[in-house]
Amino acid sequence: MPTPSASSPQPKGFRRAVSEQDTKQAEAVTSPRFIGRRQSLIEDARKEREAAAAAAAAAVASAEPGNPLEAVVFEERDGNAVLNLLFSLRGTKPSSLSRALKVFETFEAKIHHLETRPAQRPLAGSPHLEYFVRFEVPSGDLAALLSSVRRVSDDVRSAREDKVPWFPRKVSELDKCHHLVTKFDPDLDLDHPGFSDQAYRQRRKLIAEIAFQYKQGEPIPHVEYTKEEIATWKEVYATLKGLYATHACREHLEAFQLLERYCGYREDSIPQLEDVSHFLKERTGFQLRPVAGLLSARDFLASLAFRVFQCTQYIRHASSPMHSPEPDCCHELLGHVPMLADRTFAQFSQDIGLASLGASDEEIEKLSTVYWFTVEFGLCKQNGELKAYGAGLLSSYGELLHSLSEEPEVRAFDPDTAAVQPYQDQTYQPVYFVSESFSDAKDKLRNYASRIQRPFSVKFDPYTLAIDVLDSPHTIRRSLEGVQDELHTLTQALSAIS
């Protein structure tokens, strides 16, 4: 089986075949699992991208042959059509431009912007220029205007305006990031373990209401968990904790001990998000925010940019304690929270979020896939051994065993490769990516993110909890002033100890 380093064979005790494991472990790896698909950010991001592409294709397909509006992209605004138009002039005489502009005057079009550009497709005998005009005209006159422009100009075509998708600029705007993916809701999915359990469904609605009513900055309301919910937690907690010493990474183990000491992590009590959020805030600046289910990929990643982790409060159904088709508090509290208490990993998580702000649907899908193979199912090397750091592994007994057995393929982490790697959401992953260290993974991610096409860069301001959009010399200079202040403080500190 390929591994990142052939010169460093893995200890037999950590990468064993399923057949070599004890009976309980073997059953956990091979036992039937919940047959519904696990929810994932990748699936949601893919659907968003495909929906946008389908809408664009439908618009083109619906255009009638010979229609002047065929393949023309415009925006409806108060009965007017607003669009960008590109065209080339016929001939080189100045009167050619006059004739073209006369058309806009005749139809009383309001011109917002006019400029010349180097022609992308220069015509023989014509100047190597084309004209870009953004204008507004009554919608009923648009077809006639375009027909007239085509009679006096060449290569007439509309240009879609590149719009940057909305993203929150202030932490308070996370209240708008609430788009849930409900495919695996117990009220809707026949295969969900809780579908036929009316009491469970009502309980989920009650807990979900906390998230729906929550506003950023408020204390997170406590949940009084039932005896059955605590019993489910106890089974998951005790089973997974028995594996952590040999399978979890060093950072997870250290944070888990602190959580047991300060946040009430124990078998007979489910920790409250408010207490855990205070703990994380003091450690790495991350905060928790209650959420009713799986958020859309764009909304979830945007939250990470503010060091806010959207966290569920409900618990999986008692009939399926070792597996859940959706994120629940076992997954969040046992898998994600300990890792978010590590400074380097917290920065890695925030970097993924920052890279997502204003990114295209295609890039969101790729970032979601990188997130899947790192934050959810990532492995790392420590002291020559493979260890798990992904929350999907650290909250699933069977997959944790599987990931460190000899069954799956293990590859060195490379964001470009991971971003397009097919993923598995019906059974265990056949492929995992291993990082040399969290610092190495962070550097590789930043290099990958620097190549995402956006007309700006972004920076998180920890004082105002806001996103600084760096899109002008002024905003960059202002950001540099803050860096200079920090460097001055560090220089003084070095002088004091030297």
UniProtKB/Swiss-Prot annotation:
Its main location: cytoplasm. Residues 1-33 are annotated as: Disordered. One of its GO terms (biological process) is heart development. Inhibited in feedback fashion by the catecholamine neurotransmitters, especially by dopamine in competition with tetrahydrobiopterin. Phosphorylation of several Ser/Thr residues in the N-terminus regulates the catalytic activity. Ser-31 and Ser-40 are readily phosphorylated to activate the catalytic activity. A Cysteine modification induced by N-ethylmaleimide (NEM), inhibits tyrosine 3-monooxygenase activity through the modification of the Cys-177. Gene3D superfamilies: 3.30.70.260, Aromatic amino acid hydroxylase (1.10.800.10). Disruption phenotype: Homozygotes deficient mice are deficient in catecholamines, and usually die around embryonic day 11.5-15.5 due to cardiac failure. Increased number of persisting retinal hyaloid vessels due to loss of hyaloid vessel regression at P8. It catalyses: (6R)-L-erythro-5,6,7,8-tetrahydrobiopterin + L-tyrosine + O2 = (4aS,6R)-4a-hydroxy-L-erythro-5,6,7,8-tetrahydrobiopterin + L-dopa. Keywords: Catecholamine biosynthesis, Cell projection, Cytoplasm, Cytoplasmic vesicle, Iron, Metal-binding, Monooxygenase, Neurotransmitter biosynthesis, Nucleus, Oxidoreductase, Phosphoprotein, Synapse. It is found in: Cytoplasm, Perinuclear region; Nucleus; Cell projection, Axon; Cytoplasm. Residues 1-10 have a biased composition (Polar residues). Its EC number is 1.14.16.2. Phosphorylated on Ser-19, Ser-31 and Ser-40 by several protein kinases with different site specificities. Phosphorylation at Ser-31 and Ser-40 leads to an increase of TH activity. Phosphorylation at Ser-40 activates the enzyme and also counteracts the feedback inhibition of TH by catecholamines. Phosphorylation of Ser-19 and Ser-31 triggers the proteasomal degradation of TH through the ubiquitin-proteasome pathway. Phosphorylation at Ser-31 facilitates transport of TH from the soma to the nerve terminals via the microtubule network. Fe cation binds at residues 331, 336, 376. It holds the Pfam family TOH_N. Pathway: Catecholamine biosynthesis; dopamine biosynthesis; dopamine from L-tyrosine: step 1/2. It is an enzyme of class 1 (oxidoreductase). GO terms for cellular component: axon; cytoplasm; cytoplasmic side of plasma membrane; melanosome membrane; neuron projection; nucleus; perikaryon; perinuclear region of cytoplasm. The keyword Metal-binding applies. Expressed in the adrenal gland. Expressed in the retina. Expressed in the in the striatum (at protein level). GO terms for molecular function: enzyme binding; iron ion binding; tyrosine 3-monooxygenase activity. The record marks 425 as: Important for substrate specificity. Belongs to the biopterin-dependent aromatic amino acid hydroxylase family. Catalyzes the conversion of L-tyrosine to L-dihydroxyphenylalanine (L-Dopa), the rate-limiting step in the biosynthesis of catecholamines, dopamine, noradrenaline, and adrenaline. Uses tetrahydrobiopterin and molecular oxygen to convert tyrosine to L-Dopa. In addition to tyrosine, is able to catalyze the hydroxylation of phenylalanine and tryptophan with lower specificity. Positively regulates the regression of retinal hyaloid vessels during postnatal development. This is Tyrosine 3-monooxygenase. It comes from Mus musculus. The lineage of its organism: Eukaryota, Metazoa, Chordata, Craniata, Vertebrata.
